Curated annotation (Swiss-Prot):
The keyword Phosphoprotein does not apply. One of its GO terms (cellular component) is cytosolic large ribosomal subunit. SUPFAM superfamilies: Ribosomal proteins L15p and L18e. Keywords: Ribonucleoprotein, Ribosomal protein, RNA-binding, rRNA-binding. Residues 1-41 are annotated as: Disordered. GO terms for biological process: translation. It comes from Rhodopseudomonas palustris (strain BisB18). GO terms for molecular function: rRNA binding; structural constituent of ribosome. InterPro entries: Ribosomal_uL15, Ribosomal_uL15/eL18, Ribosomal_uL15/eL18_sf, Ribosomal_uL15_bac-type, Ribosomal_uL15_CS. This is Large ribosomal subunit protein uL15. Binds to the 23S rRNA.
């Protein structure tokens, strides 16, 4: 067998239909688009139109709302804090707050504040200032000999909320 003998199986590759190329092709004149009107034009479709039937997005009820005063906290778990202390990216002797976490690269951004979550185990004695913490996280920090100070969350500006 030579390289020139290799070929596709018969019928495995089909040529595309060239539409609008005369009546004899079977796809001439309207090119398979039916008669005139909106659907015969290019690029024009009514999204969600179901032929006059009430569309699904109008049959379903509206639910909920977007709270403009909602605060979005950056979350950090105890195991992530312990990893950072072990890797010496965070100085465990000082106060750990949103600024130190962002500066050390543990958090990408502080958002509207930092919330401490209780996953994992903390061995280091840390002084932590956060905007929120779970009960299990506070208990774990205090068990390790540290303290947690809950700060008031920063309020959003009037311009951002609207």
């Amino acid at each position: 067998m030579k390289l020139s003998d290799i070929a596709d199986n018969a019928g495995s590759r089909k040529k595309r239909m060239r539409v609008g190329r005369g009546i004899g092709s079977g796809k001439g004149k309207t090119a398979g688009r039916g008669g005139k009107g909106q659907t015969a034009r290019s690029g024009v479709r009514i999204k969600g139109f179901e032929g006059g039937q009430m569309p699904l997005h109008r049959r379903l009820p509206k639910r909920g709302f977007n709270n403009i005063f909602r605060l979005d906290f950056a979350e950090i778990n105890l195991d992530r804090l312990q990893e950072a202390v072990d890797a010496k990216t965070i100085d465990g002797s000082g106060v750990i707050n949103a600024e130190t976490l962002v500066a050390s690269g543990v958090l990408r951004r502080a958002k509207d504040g930092v919330r401490l979550l209780g996953r994992g185990e903390l061995k280091a004695k840390l002084t932590i200032e956060v905007h929120g913490a779970t009960k299990t996280a506070i208990e774990a920090v205090e068990k390790a000999g540290g303290t947690v100070k809950i700060l008031a969350p920063a309020k959003k500006d009037e311009g951002e909320a609207a």
